[in-house]
UniProtKB/Swiss-Prot annotation:
SUPFAM superfamilies: Immunoglobulin. Residues 279-292 have a biased composition (Acidic residues). Residues 19-360 are virion surface. Glycans are attached at residues 41, 102. It is a single-pass type I membrane protein. This is Envelope glycoprotein D.
Amino acid sequence: MQGPTLAVLGALLAVAVSLPTPAPRVTVYVDPPAYPMPRYNYTERWHTTGPIPSPFADGREQPVEVRYATSAAACDMLALIADPQVGRTLWEAVRRHARAYNATVIWYKIESGCARPLYYMEYTECEPRKHFGYCRYRTPPFWDSFLAGFAYPTDDELGLIMAAPARLVEGQYRRALYIDGTVAYTDFMVSLPAGDCWFSKLGAARGYTFGACFPARDYEQKKVLRLTYLTQYYPQEAHKAIVDYWFMRHGGVVPPYFEESKGYEPPPAADGGSPAPPGDDEAREDEGETEDGAAGREGNGGPPGPEGDGESQTPEANGGAEGEPKPGPSPDADRPEGWPSLEAITHPPPAPATPAAPDAVPVSVGIGIAAAAIACVAAAAAGAYFVYTRRRGAGPLPRKPKKLPAFGNVNYSALPG
């Protein structure tokens, strides 16, 4: 009996050893980083609220480059990087002897018939002979609060890094880069590997998700305002430090560098993984569906294209039932100790002081001063007239006797003549 029993136990032990060891779900201590300084000096301009441009303005005359982005494991980092040929654009500006340029970087998440604004940043009076983003003036970065908790811009502020993204992050992203009014679009198709990361800032399970989704009509009517639907966040240097700090505290390893995203080719769906997002052909087919975009979203038919019409889709509207994901708390909950809170850095600067108007003089005092001035002028005029009339009738004034030099000790005067 012992022989078969030992054989069975040995087989079970061998199977147990061959199984992968589950990753420990614990946090580790990491020295909190110091608040970083900006790479260069600039002036932060607080802009009043304004509309976010539509991401659906592309067409045949405006081609869109498409890239594919994924990560090796669920708890890894994901990079959305594509060279938009900014260096060539800036070199052309130098050849034109342009002293400066203006730029805007915007990120969207494209859904069925709508787009979610994720990130907005403006640059003014930029130096074309330096790297992109070296400018005299910049606005604060404006973020979707959910995405800001686990994502940050790359060092050149043109790419996007996500740390342990949740399953709901999959889909199509669009970057719009404006330089002196000319826009260049780049799409990123994000697909995640099988499995879920235990420390992801995920949506459905914990009730956090992206903000509202707006159809093309709302963008065209300038209803999507950046200060209404986006939140001001830390500068890029501090944003990177806080997300990396949170990622490393949960056992993550930040890569020393990130490779550029590959050209988009629909990958096969891995076992347990989500299928890749549709390509341009399916999107164009979707655009040709019924004009009633809202009905297309709610019915069993295929999703409409980005030009579909309808009301703005909030997370509650997308879910359609109570208990669906809702926007999460402030994304600075994981900031290192000693760092300024978002409330401390996101308040608008005080309005410029205007010189105060002088205190108004009471009416009675003003009347008294005016009366006194009139009396003084009248008295002076009366005195001058009195002297003039007296002298007019009296003739010329008598001459004073002319003194003559003394002769000896005798003084005398010249006779009047």
